[in-house]
Structure formats: C-alpha cells, structure tokens
C-alpha cells in the first residue's frame, strides 16, 4: 500500500513543488498519522491509515471503482463498534486539519496579493459586450480594482459618490448552526497559529522548528482526547456566544484595516477621492433575535443578547483605552496640549474626585494619561450599569429603582451614548493633531467606535407573518367587530389597518389576558421599544417578516408597532423598519405587486426612513434563497430572485424610493451559498448602487472569519464586488432573448424538480430512509427545531437546512442541481444550435456564468456509487422497487446535467479550469469514501436495534443491558460520522 507521500511523488501532475498547499499537506499527513500511532493501539492505527490510503491510491492507480469500494466496504463492515468510532473520529480530525491548512494557504495568498503592487494589468482582454471585470472569476484587491476602473475611465466623481453612499451590512445568523464545538474551534485556532509559525521556516533554526512541530502534535493529541460532540443542546445564549467570538477575536481589530487598504489603493489611483465613512461596512445579527420557529428566543433572551453585545464592546474599549494610556505618555514639559482638553480635565476632576486623588500625582504632567483614566472610569461605570440591566431584565425600570446605593453615582456618570465616548476620544485626537502628532492607535479606536458603537451589531427581529395576523385576529375577536379580521378580503384588511394606523386612540386594551402566543407577540414590540430607549435605535430597528405574502402582512406589523409606541403619528416617523421576506417562488413573483400596493399608500411612504444627501425614502426587502430552492429547485429559485430584483428596482425607481436588497443566502449552494464575489457580480445591474445586506450563516463563519487575513480577504472580496457591480453597468440583463431562454429553463427545471420532490409520493420515505435526516435531528447543535411544526413529518414542515444537510451527507447534493440537465436538454432538443447561445451566455452573462459554476462545483462533489450504497443498504425491502426507480431518475438526471455542463463550458472534466479547487475536491472526494460507508454501517446497525421492541428496564438481563448501551454508542458513532462528512464536504446545510 502506497502512502500519501509516495502517491503524490509518483503522480507529478497532482503536485507542484512550489504549491504551498501540496507542500504543507504532507506535513498534515505526517501529523495525522503520528497522532494516530501515539493515541490508538498499533493495529488500529495502522488499519485506519491503511483505510485512508486505500481510498485514494486505488483510484489513482486506475483500479476499478467498484472493486476498490468493495474492499473499503469489507473493511468497514468488519470493524467492531470501538474501531468504528475511532475511524469516524480519525477521518473527522483529518478533514478538519485539511480545512485549517487550506484556510492558512488562502490567508497567505491574500497577503501576497495585497502586498503585490504589480497589478498593472491591461483590461484590453475584457469582452466589450460583457460587464467589465465580470469575467474575472477570482476576486480582485482594492488596488487592482481601482486601477482597472481608472483604465476604464470611471470618473473620480462617480466613484466618490458611490463610496459616500456605500452601505454593506453582513448579518450573522445561527442557522445552520456550526457543527463544530466551540472548544474544538479554539484548538483549531491554536493549530492554525502554530502552522503559521512553522511555515516561515526560513527564519527558524532547526531546534525552533522541531519545537513548534512538537507543540503542534501535542495540541492535536489534546484535540483527539476532547469530545467532538456537543454534550447538550445549546441555548440561544450559547449560540450568541459562539457568533460573537469572531468579533472579539478577529473583526474588532480587522475592520479598521479594511478602510486603511481602501485608502492606500485610492492613493495610487484616485488620490483626490474621499474615503467612505468608517462604518461603510458594518454588521447585523439574528442570533438571539430571530424568533421564527424558535420558541427559545423570547423577549428576555433578546434583551440579554443586547446587553451581552454591549458588555463585549465595553470590555474591548477598556482594553484599548488602557493600552492608549500606556502609550500616550506625552508630558506637558515637552509638548503643548489643547485648551479644550485641559478644560475637560477640570470638568472631569469635579465629577471624579476619587480618580483625581488616585491619579493626579502620578499623571500631574501627563494630561493624556489623566484624561484616559477618567475615560476608563466612565467605561467601567457604563459596564456596571449594563450588568445591572442584564441581570434585571427588560421590564426593569432603573428610574424607579431606589434600593441600590451605587445607582445614583452610576446613573449620573456613565456614558449615556456612544457619542459621549467619541467626543472624549476626539478631544484627545484633536489635541494631538494641534501639536503635530498623529497617534494611529487613537484613530484605530475611533474607527472601531464608529463601526461597532456600544451595541456591536444591529439585532434584526424576525418573525413569521401568521404570528401577527393571529394576534390581530384575537384582538378583533375581543373587540367584536362586525366583520372578523380573518373573514376580510385583502383590500378590506388594508383599509381597516390604515384606518387604525391613522387613529390616535389606542386599539389594544391594557387589562386583557391574551393567549400566551399573542401576549409574547405583543411583548416583542414592547421589548424593542425598551431596547431603543436604552441602547438607541441602532441596536434594533429592522423587523423582518418571514413568509410575507401580502401588503397586509407589513401593515399588521406597523399597527402593532404603533400600539406599542414605536410609531410617532405626529411626525409620521416609524422607529421600526419593516422588512418583508419573500421566500417561495410564488411570493417572489408576487413581490412587485405587493410592494406597489404599499407604495401607493401615502401613509406607508411617509413612514419610510429618509437617507443620504438626497433624503430619499428607503425600502429594505429580503429575498429568501432556501425555501424557494426547496420549493422549486435551483434554477427556478435563482431566476425568480433575479427577476424579482429587476422588477422591484424598476418599481422603486418609478416611485422615487431607494431600495436595499437583503439576500438571505445559506452556506450551501442549495440555499444560495457559494463564492460571494461571483454572486454579487451576478446581481442585476442597478439593483445594488452600493447598498447590500447579506446573511453570513453560522456554518461558514469559521471559514471566513477565524483568521485575521481571511476575514479581511472576505470583507475586501464583498466590497470590491459591490463597487464593481455598481459602477460597471451590465445592460445584458435587459436582453429579451436571454431572459426568455432563462424563463423557459427555470420553468422546465421547476417542473422536473417538483415532479420528483413534491409529486412523487415515495420521495419523503426515500429521503428519511436513505439519508441520516433523523439522526441529524439528534445532533445537539441548534436551539431551533429541525421542523417548523412539532411532530409533523411531512416535507413542507421540514426546514430547508436539514433538507440540504441530509442530501449532502449521503452524497446526492440533490437540491443544488436536480432539474438543470432536463431544462438544458429541452432547449437543445428543440434546437441543437442553442448550444452556441448557451456558450455565449456562459462567457458573457455573469448571472448565467454563476449558475453554471455553482452547478459544476456541486456535481464534482456528488458520488452516486456511494449514494447507491446508502439506498441499497438503508432502504427497506418493501420500498425497494420505488426507491430503485427514484435512484434511477436521480442518476439519469445527474449524467445528463454533467454532460451538458461540460458541453457548455467546453471542458473535458469538471473543475478543469480551477486547479486549486479541483485538487481540494478530488482529495476530499476520495478520502471521504470510507466515512460514508462507515456511516451507512452504523446507521444500519442503529436502525436495526431501534426497530426491536422496547424492553422494560426491570426485565433487562446483562446481555439486554449491553444491547441498550450499544444503541446509545451506535448513535454516538453515527453522529461522529455526520461531523466528519460535514468537515469533509465543508458544509452542512
């Protein structure tokens, strides 16, 4: 059996001596094998190493695929439970080490691209009929982008106007939740840092390098002895802690650098263009505020989340301010100080006599240090007050509190707003400037304050539309209206809602006991008002309505907001931005009609916030990728979202309203995921205009934000794509022939997808039996239930996340490609010459290119031989014929789709033009095979035991007790394989 090193050395086309990924992969291989040999029994370690080597060496040697896979199956089926669990853990560890390595290499490549100033590439090779720059698959840096824009004669004024209006918001979510434990993430960070040190080998002595390798191995050995599985179902606050980890460890320090890189790139190409605002790229969060289908997200949880976010920011500011105090040792003996700063010191001396007495002697000639001591005390008092609020809950009224002796002091001296903190820092900055000093640390802290404030990220409230209509229905029942709300037509609802919105008298009685659900719906709005009073409007000003179907869905939320004091009728201003989320294909088609009804209502238009120098009203709209894909398939979902954007932008322009589109993209292709750069470039022209809002799913946070340079790479990628799309107009969206072709492809694809998924009565059983969907639900990874309705087992109740997760685990990846081949084939059957048009679209239309690229990448991860094994082994005998038929339909569609994708792209093999991606996917596809077979083996044994009749514990003999224990261990083994495959595939749902 050849080792990985031997295989690579014997196949020169698979490795480049200069490729850092291949070079360091050998280090990972040696590390993995070394850890197994030290942590596992000798025979077990050798067998696991042999199993992995078998998976790729046989394929490279040209062995029959079926033959070598049978060898793997034989080995897997011969393993006892302990060895199976060890194998699952070993392969999971391997893939996570490879992931860390690839992230490190990506980080290094970004550093090289950023530091490389030789970007003077001619744009002459760009197709003049395609959007300039859009044919570049790889993201460009700011320096390269601005150089090319200059070569394309983009006027400085046009670029500056865009930069000043630019508003990019990345919204962190917990769904799908990260499958890797927080504890493991910390270990991965330490491993990444050690790898980084080892990779600068030219600066290391032999002893230093050996020492680092020893530390690396010990860290991985500790990892091996750590439980990979969550021991309990995480609470919402656990999820909050996980998401905020990236702000604490990476983003707080990385964000100021992003603007700095724009400044440097502008200096080289557009020296007179003004920088965007410090907060041009900012953050939102759904973690702790998204209550759609998650009963654990209560008003109290959202309140505590806001307090926790402020706590983290105050901690960071205290550290930064303390560091500044150490740094700013300027003495009045040798430097002047502004009069404004000196006056502020006198004011602070009166307010903080204890600080003055403690610090005045030490800092008697060091005014900056004294000022920063006062600032530190204000921050600590703000922190003390925040802790009190967090412990007391959102209903607690500080003004009515009389028992706390320290409260008076806290209330009078804490920072009441981030503006007060900014003012103090500006005093220091301006004083330094007045004496010809420029402290970069002060500038950095000010930038951080502008970006994060005290709230860190805005919390979007999300709730499903029927929760509001149900609450209003209960209210109207109590009011005994002549026509009950649920009996009204849509037009009648709109009229009644507008009338009530214009009425100044309250509608909701204060002394009525509502049902628990309605009371909580009302309480959310009350809590939001309290949040805004305490934190300012920035903390929570967007209310997303999932499953929006009609204009009344938005007006209902506005009515409830009015009743809770979030709408000022006198000034006609709303403190809440109501955001409809259009999710299904039918709702996407209906979205322009819904918004047109609302835009015609003067009352509604008057409530929209006015933004920018133009002071135009702004409407935010969210587009859902997950449910539309689950509903109608990949092509139909993407095309209807594309069409909806164009229609909504045209509608907004006609009504002189600015539009901000909120893209609810998931981590996987089947939920709108994929490379952000390509996705943003593929947006219809005129729909961005420098404004975009995008979800960042929990499962991709680590791959984007775990390392500083990775975070900057992702942020620069998103920003350059937004600038590029906004400035380089793409008129091809309006080409009637292309649009008509896409509409036909979408409809045919949708029909074929729905015929299998929604119309085949056996598909649900197929999905439940041949994928680990039921076992996935037992993973303690999310506070949110996998199904929308408790106890429901129908497809409509299953969330899109576990839907995609199950297909990914079993190597079908069906939601990301099924129906594409039939749609393309139908066009070619009508006219074979259409292949030329499809090739033109692939070359010149970013949207179509993005579609084909995503399908190609997904197809490269599909393994129907492994999928067939899931069907044959896990499918029940009584369903064999129907399951065989379903598999045949899937297999036929896969082969058709693959052949046509290759024909359109002009390639011989998938991913042929992307060497790095092909190498990564190829390694994973080969090495993950044993893990799939192992999962099937464990699932089969687990389900066989589960089907046995339960036995009362009072009658358990020794053997039966062992059987019960083994069932638990089998589940554990199965869950470990789910972890491993998720790491190998690099996504869950």
Swiss-Prot record:
Keyword annotations of the record: Carbon dioxide fixation, Lyase, Magnesium
Active site, per annotation: 175, 630
Gene3D superfamilies (alphabetical): Phosphoenolpyruvate/pyruvate domain (1.20.1440.90)
Encoding gene per record: ppc
Keyword Lyase among UniProt keywords: yes
Annotated function: Forms oxaloacetate, a four-carbon dicarboxylic acid source for the tricarboxylic acid cycle.
Family per similarity comment: Belongs to the PEPCase type 1 family.
Record protein name field: Phosphoenolpyruvate carboxylase
